[in-house]
Amino acid sequence: MGSIIDAAAAADPVVLMETAFRKAVKSRQIPGAVIMARDCSGNLNYTRCFGARTVRRDECNQLPPLQVDTPCRLASATKLLTTIMALQCMERGLVDLDETVDRLLPDLSAMPVLEGFDDAGNARLRERRGKITLRHLLTHTSGLSYVFLHPLLREYMAQGHLQSAEKFGIQSRLAPPAVNDPGAEWIYGANLDWAGKLVERATGLDLEQYLQENICAPLGITDMTFKLQQRPDMLARRADQTHRNSADGRLRYDDSVYFRADGEECFGGQGVFSGPGSYMKVLHSLLKRDGLLLQPQTVDLMFQPALEPRLEEQMNQHMDASPHINYGGPMPMVLRRSFGLGGIIALEDLDGENWRRKGSLTFGGGPNIVWQIDPKAGLCTLAFFQLEPWNDPVCRDLTRTFEHAIYAQYQQG
């Protein structure tokens, strides 16, 4: 990948960057990508599409192109949408950030904490100490984790206590016990799935209907849904999921369950499908603080570090010790970070004025989707791949190169 990016060093950075993407497609390092950038003033409206939406050829032996309106799996990029929906409920007085979720999520409140296993291998469960709040859910400090990330939960599943996620019912995602008390540590987990349930119970609407009425309608979005199988217009032109073989680096079609069946309910942490252009509308609305989704003061709240110093330090230690996960995507691993309401906040500039600035908010999704909103620079960017696993080095390097090029162009005016 380095030879693609470093071949010519002194030309126009955007031209070089686009050349890198084209070469990556031509050499079959990626099937395709969509990259987008917008600014507050409307002077920058950048979109480029590269390559194909699948590695499978169609009946004409062609690879259909990946386009700005191609329906794609957002995976964890869904979490930003669910955060927005939960904050809308807060604005409307339906929930409070710091009240216990007991009223709306008694099933979560009753969930025990898995402490470990005794000498006979039996699970040791105890009552939770403290109450979970919406703020805990939005900042991943509730004590919940994902099975695939936590050794205690993996053992718990291996003993037959949990259904496989292949069942694709939300209760199989929400069934694992907590692994710590609320506020005890930052742990990445199924918090936004529970936040989605909170929105449903607070409003009386399922999350799909709420999404359509409160995010899609205000922004004029028609290709964003939890229910892909109910949208034949989107199914006909959706992207495939592609997987890179770890042994030889080759790309292969991934017959993922997520594309074959809708969830029994809506997964607020991972369940939405959307065209890249529609997702950019959400990012741009937040950047402009235009009031279409959230009041400006609520948007400002999203960008405020939400962790106390102890949790912030623990989160940084965890992230620095997890380069294989690399929650921050193209962000340098040594960067100081916090967590806001919706994503990771940079506590320092990434590279002076040449890249993301202090206070920028970022997150992404498993198919190597990376979004970021940078209020100080007045920019938002979106890199959209449909290639797993997450933290793919080719996608990561291309995303970093894209962002650097956009910042360089924008600084030049």
UniProtKB/Swiss-Prot annotation:
- Reported effect, residue 96 to R: Strongly increases simvastatin synthase activity upon overexpression in E.coli and abolishes activity with LovD-bound alpha-methylbutanoate
List the EC numbers from the record: 2.3.1.238
Catalytic activity line of the entry: monacolin J carboxylate + (S)-2-methylbutanoyl-[2-methylbutanoate polyketide synthase] = lovastatin carboxylate + holo-[2-methylbutanoate polyketide synthase]
Which residues does the Swiss-Prot or TrEMBL record annotate as the active site? 76
Q: Which residues form a coiled coil?
A: none
Q: Does the keyword Acyltransferase apply?
A: yes
Documented effect of changing residue 174 to F: Strongly increases simvastatin synthase activity upon overexpression in E.coli and abolishes activity with LovD-bound alpha-methylbutanoate
Q: How is it used?
A: Lovastatin acts as a hypolipidemic agent that works as inhibitor of (3S)-hydroxymethylglutaryl-coenzyme A (HMG-CoA) reductase (HMGR) which reduces HMG-CoA to mevalonate and is the key step in cholesterol biosynthesis. Lovastatin, simvastatin and related compounds are widely used to treat hypercholesteremia and reduce the risk of cardiovascular disease. Furthermore, statins such as lovastatin were found to be anticancer agents.
Q: Name one GO molecular function term.
A: acyltransferase activity
Q: What is the effect of changing residue 241 to M?
A: Strongly increases simvastatin synthase activity upon overexpression in E.coli and abolishes activity with LovD-bound alpha-methylbutanoate
Keyword Acyltransferase among UniProt keywords: yes
In the record, the effect of residue 164 to G is given as:
Strongly increases simvastatin synthase activity upon overexpression in E.coli and abolishes activity with LovD-bound alpha-methylbutanoate
Provide the alphabetized UniProt keywords: Acyltransferase, Hydrolase, Transferase
PANTHER family the UniProt entry points to: (LOVD), PUTATIVE (AFU_ORTHOLOGUE AFUA_5G00920)-RELATED (PTHR43283:SF17), BETA-LACTAMASE-RELATED (PTHR43283)
Q: Subunit notes for this chain?
A: Interacts with LovF.
Name the record gives this protein: Monacolin J acid methylbutanoyltransferase
Species lineage: Eukaryota, Fungi, Dikarya, Ascomycota, Pezizomycotina
Encoding gene per record: lovD
